[in-house]
């Protein structure tokens, strides 16, 4: 039930900037049609104070580091996590942290940190190389698949081994209505926790999904269901959100 005035979860936009230029980006390239900037630690501290002060008797609190690309402001992410943990001890709270990333800046140091501090990590990739490179180019127009795929595999493997949550987050558009093939592609790469969702866009955009696309979309979901059920209970099982 809704409790008036109670806040137990927060999406913290630590970066209004991004190093990709995804065609369908709801944030207009990460800056939400505003000046490119990153959140200061002082603002992040105020956000943590706010959620603690407004959480009532809730013990378990959640913060999702988001953007833009949050790893462009990684130092503030780390400082905010430490501050939240310190404050949580004072007030008898427990924080769970999630970070959503386009995976470009991931390296061994960052991956180790995420495995230590993040309850969940959301890894953005849209599917097969030709699909991802079309929908998620870099700022200079080049494809991003080759920049991120090894990073994604490394994160997934390490978190699988540690029993930690992650999931692959893909977006399908008019250009890949056969998105069940992208889910199969993820599986073939060793990825087991998967999600794909439809783009939300104005119908005038060439990638927008329209009513006429629904039969093909339903066919893809039917095929995806068959694939899922075939592998359920076997060593080829995967989770789909």
Predicted regions and their residues:
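Aromatic/hydrophobic pocket-lining residues that form the small-molecule binding cavity
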Residues: 40, 44, 77, 148, ...
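Conserved radical SAM core fold
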Residues: 30-31, 70-72, 103-108, 120-142, ...
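Glycine-enriched alpha-helix->loop->beta-strand junction motifs that scaffold or abut catalytic
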Residues: 115-121, 190-192
């Amino acid at each position: 039930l809704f409790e008036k005035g109670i806040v137990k979860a927060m999406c913290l936009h630590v970066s209004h900037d991004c190093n990709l230029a995804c065609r369908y980006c709801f944030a207009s390239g990460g800056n939400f049609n505003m000046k490119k900037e990153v959140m200061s630690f002082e603002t992040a501290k105020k956000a943590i104070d706010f959620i603690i002060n407004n959480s009532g008797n809730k013990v378990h609190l959640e913060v999702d580091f988001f953007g833009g690309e949050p790893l462009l402001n990684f130092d503030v992410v780390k400082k905010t996590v430490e501050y939240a943990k310190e404050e949580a001890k004072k007030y008898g709270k427990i924080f769970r942290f999630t970070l959503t990333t386009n995976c470009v800046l991931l390296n061994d140091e960052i991956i180790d940190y995420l495995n230590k501090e993040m309850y969940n990590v959301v890894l953005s990739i849209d599917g097969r190389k030709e699909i991802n490179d079309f929908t998620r180019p870099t700022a200079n127009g080049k494809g991003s698949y080759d920049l991120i795929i090894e990073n994604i595999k490394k994160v997934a493997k390490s978190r699988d081994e540690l029993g930690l949550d992650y999931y692959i987050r893909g977006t399908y558009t008019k250009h890949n209505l056969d998105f069940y093939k992208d889910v199969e592609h993820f599986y073939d790469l060793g990825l087991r926790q998967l999600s794909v969702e439809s783009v939300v866009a104005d119908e005038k955009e060439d990638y927008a999904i329209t009513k006429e696309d629904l039969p093909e979309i339903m066919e893809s979901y039917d095929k995806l269901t068959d694939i899922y059920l075939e592998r359920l209970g076997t060593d080829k099982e995967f989770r789909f959100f």
